[in-house]
Structure formats: C-alpha cells, structure tokens
Regions:
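Intrinsically disordered, low-complexity, charged terminal extensions of DNA damage-control enzymes
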Residues: 1-41, 46, 196-221, 236-396
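Catalytic cores of DNA base-excision repair glycosylases
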Residues: 2-12, 16-21, 30, 34-245, ...
Length: 396
C-alpha cells in the first residue's frame, strides 16, 4: 500500500515532500517483510541472550561480520558468561581478542563484567539507561542489547542505519555531527514506542489466553530488536557504502528521496578525511635457537600492553639495526631480509621492513625490556597484534 502511494508522488523542487516521521512510519512494513525473508543466519542471532548480544555487538564495531564469526565462537567457548569474563586474566583476554584490533574494546568488556558482578548481581540490567552506564558501552550498543535481548523500544543507530536514513530523507546535514544522530535516535525511538504500544494494545485486547499466546509466537508480531536489526541489515546488504547501492533490491526504493533524485551516492554527507600519517619501521626478528625476542608495549597509547617484536623507527639494513640494538657482529650467526608489510590504523600507517637476526648465543642481545620466548608461545600465550601478522607467520 505504502509503496504504491509513494510511487505516485512527484518530487517537489527544493523541498522534501512529507515529514520524516511519515516516511519513517511508511518504511516499517516493507522493511520488516524484507528482513524476515533475507536476514543472514548469524551465530549470535541463534540465541539472543543479553551476554551473547553484548559480546557480538562489541566485536562488530569496526569489524566485518565474516571476520567476527570465528572470534565470537572462540570467545564464547572460552568465556561463556559474565562471571568468567570478569575473572579472566588480561593477557588471556587479549590473546582471545588477538586479530580483532581496537583492543580497548576487550579491556572495557572486562571492566564492564566486573561492574556487572559488583553492582548488578552478575546480570545485564534490563534497562537501556543502566546498560549505558557500563564501561565501553555507548548509545548504539545499549540500544542493541536492550532491544534485541529484552524487547525494549530502544533505538540502535550505527553507521549502517545512518547511511540508510540519510538517503531515505536526502538529508544534507553532516552525518558525523551529534545533531544528526540525536535527531535520528529521537525519530527511531518515537517509532519504536508507537509500534510497541500498538502491539501491546493488540495483545491486551485478546479475549482469551490462547489467542494471545498464538499472537506472541507469530513472526508478524512487532519486536523492537528485529526492527533495529532490519535497518542494520538493509545498510549492510543493500544500501551499501563506497559506491552505488543496490536500489533495485531495496524494499524502500519508492520511499527513498535520494533514489528518486538519482543522488544516492551523495549521501551520507561527510567532511573530507584527513590523510593518515605514515611511519616507517624496521621490525627485527631476533632469534636464538627456538626463541625470539619480544617486548611489551606501553600501557597507554596505540596497541597498549600488547607484545611486539623489537622494532626501530625508520628503514634500516640488518647491519644498521644490529648496531643500533647493541648486537655485536661477532654474536650474529646470520641475517636475512624479510618481506615488507603495511598496516593501516585509523589515523596512521605503518610501513615496515623486516630483518631477521639469528644469534650465536643467548647472551648476544641484552635488553631488560625483552623476553626471549619459544615460538609456540606466540600462538597460545602472548598477544601479538595483527600489525605484525606477516612476521608472526614467518615464525610459526
């Protein structure tokens, strides 16, 4: 009905026809119908308990769904509940997180788990406002957990949803500004509350418990978590970034102002990105027999408290690196040039060259900050960030 109605409208020059609230309300039915037919089967959707929803949402921040799947399975097997997460040793936690990046997410998970044990009896609170008080949880994650796990009418606005809505409304506002996100959260929350109240009124109007029970089992019944996930899924699968969206597959095609104007790729509006800073490094694999030198990074800053291979600023030959590290030529068995590697962070790029330095004796390299560890321990004990993956693969 809505599709036919909006398809008959003519775009108005210089203004958006119809209020955003009306356009949002008209989107609900086709969006949910599409989602129920096209949603992906994901492990965290199988049993949407508060803990698993929380862990998955934190992992999915800045990380692709396919990349998260094996990490989620491994994490849930090792730390299946809030109690085990609160008690885990930090190095063990970081090792489980190794490869996902943005390690502050893992540390905040543990901090939040400790808070849950101390203040909430080891349970995730069934309140968006209370969830929002936990370390590492922002508005999106709080809304996702509250709506998916507890069926509460709380919005969950991530980058996917922002992209869909800015195109739906042809919104010229800067999408990186809090004002736009706050506006959309209010719009979505009002729609969630309206639809949830309609559902509850329908259920309470049932004459007998049997009819109400049947309605509760019906897939046609409105659920806030499903509604939120439908917007996210549409942005991930159809209204995609970095090119032309798949408008011909979109259930909101005839409702979308950007599509009607042929301006899909102009939204969302963002300021130009600042170029990333480039840092050159020489990564040294200093080996003696089956051991390799690693050291722990600072507890603050990039890759805080993780382990790394010895490295130097700038690009240096093996001989130059050995000299700078105080390794005598007489203590070197052999050297080897290793492949170059590039790792991109949000604000900086590391351009690395690798140098292998094999020692004749254990005492050939002296540094109190360095540990000589067995290669096998790189796999099961010490968390080495993905930035050094090329060099870790050489060792294991």
């Amino acid at each position: 009905m809505y599709k036919d109605f909006y398809a008959s409208l003519k775009p108005l020059e210089g203004e958006i026809p119809y209020a955003e609230e009306e356009r949002l309300a008209a989107s609900g039915a086709p969006l949910l119908s599409w989602y129920r037919k096209n949603r992906r089967l994901l492990p965290w959707r199988e049993n949407p308990e508060p803990y698993s929803v929380w862990i998955s949402e934190i992992m999915l921040q800045q990380t692709r769904v396919e990349a998260v799947k094996p990490y989620f399975a491994r994490f849930m097997e090792a730390l299946p509940d809030i109690t085990s997460l609160a008690q885990v040793d930090e190095e063990r936690l970081l090792k489980l997180w190794e490869g996902l990046g943005y390690y502050s997410r893992a540390r905040n998970l543990k901090k939040a788990a400790v808070c849950l044990m101390e203040d909430y009896g080891g349970q995730m609170p069934a309140s968006r406002d209370e969830i929002l008080k936990l370390p590492g949880i922002g508005s999106y994650t709080a809304g996702a957990v509250a709506s998916i796990a507890y069926d509460l009418p709380a919005p969950a606005l991530d980058g996917n949803v922002v992209r869909v809505l800015t195109r739906l409304f042809a919104d010229p506002q800067d999408s990186t500004k809090p004002a736009l996100r706050n506006k959309y959260e209010r719009r979505l929350e009002a729609e969630l509350v309206r639809r949830t109240e309609e559902r509850d009124s329908y259920l309470s109007a049932g004459d007998d418990a049997g009819e109400v029970s049947t309605a509760l089992r019906s897939e046609e019944l409105f659920h806030p978590g499903e509604y939120n996930q439908a917007w996210i899924e549409l942005g991930a699968l159809v209204c995609i970034p970095g090119g032309r969206p798949l408008c011909e597959k979109c259930p909101l095609e005839s409702l979308c102002l950007a599509h009607r104007r042929g301006e899909e790729e102009q939204y969302p509006v963002k300021p130009p990105k600042k170029p990333r800073r480039i840092e050159e490094k020489t990564v040294c694999l200093i080996e003696w027999e089956d051991t390799v030198a690693i050291r722990k990074r600072s507890s603050k800053g990039l890759l805080a408290s993780l382990y790394e291979y010895v490295n130097l600023d700038g690009k240096k030959s093996a001989a130059e690196a050995a000299k700078e590290l105080g390794i005598a030529e007489a203590d070197i068995r052999e050297t080897e040039d290793l492949p170059d590697a590039v790792h991109i962070f949000s604000h900086v790029e590391w351009h690395m060259c690798g140098r292998r330095i094999r020692l004749k004796r254990a005492s050939g390299y002296q540094d109190k900050a360095v540990l000589m560890v067995c290669r096998a321990q790189l796999q099961d004990r010490y968390p080495i960030p993905n930035a050094f993956r090329v060099y870790t693969n050489i060792l294991i």
